[in-house]
Regions:
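Short clusters of hydrophobic/aromatic residues that line enzyme substrate/ligand-binding pockets
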Residues: 29, 55, 62-63, 98, ...
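ATP-dependent small-molecule kinase catalytic core of the GHMP/sugar-kinase superfamily
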Residues: 2-31, 122-188
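DPxDG-like acidic metal-binding loop motif
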Residues: 70, 100-130, 142
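N-terminal beta-alpha supersecondary unit
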Residues: 2-86
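Short, charged, solvent-exposed linker or helix-capping segments at domain edges/interfaces
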Residues: 53-55, 102, 180-186
Length: 188
């Protein structure tokens, strides 16, 4: 049994342009994304035996079944790597508010994917990991590098840039109000 504690940080969009929807259902975007110091905490246990993924979450509004992006990450990693599924448990302590455009789920997925890759001997290099991340979600590749970047295409074109912002930011998210990323993009 191997235990890990990882912190998956949020991101902000410093401007976001959303363009036409492609035939595959994804929109092209152009955005500047920057990581921020607000993180979820994940306690992850690898049991060194065959099995499945079990997710628990401090936020009861977050699904812990196949609808959770961590399941998609787990499934895609094992399918693509051709490794047998191992029993893994994740306890997700949420601090990043959901439905706030801060990339909480994508961050969880990106950091979990990086840990899976490391745990199984760095099967993928960074570029391959970004391509795998794109199969999970369009914000997930950003969290592979997790540095300020201009993100374009469908989220798959990531160009690191210098972050000269020195000011602090204040984020305000109403408690009982949010917009899912999927719903926001469907309005375009």
């Amino acid at each position: 049994m191997n235990k890990y504690k990882i912190f998956s940080n949020a991101k902000i969009n410093i401007g976001l342009n959303v363009f036409q929807k492609e035939d595959d259902g994804y929109h092209n975007i152009d955005s500047i994304m920057a990581p921020i110091d607000l993180s979820d905490e994940m306690d992850i246990i690898f049991y060194s035996e065959l099995g499945d993924l079990k997710i628990e979450c401090s936020d009861k509004n977050i699904p812990t079944d196949e609808r959770n992006i961590l399941y998609k990450t787990y499934k895609i990693f094992f399918e693509e790597s051709k490794k047998e599924k191992e029993k893994i448990s994740v306890f997700l302590k949420k601090s990043i508010p959901s439905e706030a455009g801060l990339g909480g789920g994508s961050s969880n997925a990106g950091f979990f994917l990086k840990l899976l890759n490391k745990y199984y001997g760095n099967i993928y290099n960074e570029k391959e990991l970004e391509e795998l991340a794109m199969k999970i979600g369009s914000d997930v590749p950003f969290f592979i590098k997790n540095k300020t970047a201009r993100v374009s295409g469908k989220g798959n074109k990531i160009e690191l840039i210098e972050n000269n912002l020195k000011d602090s930011i204040i984020l305000i998210k109403p408690i009982n109000f949010g917009v899912s990323t999927k719903e926001a993009y469907e309005s375009f």
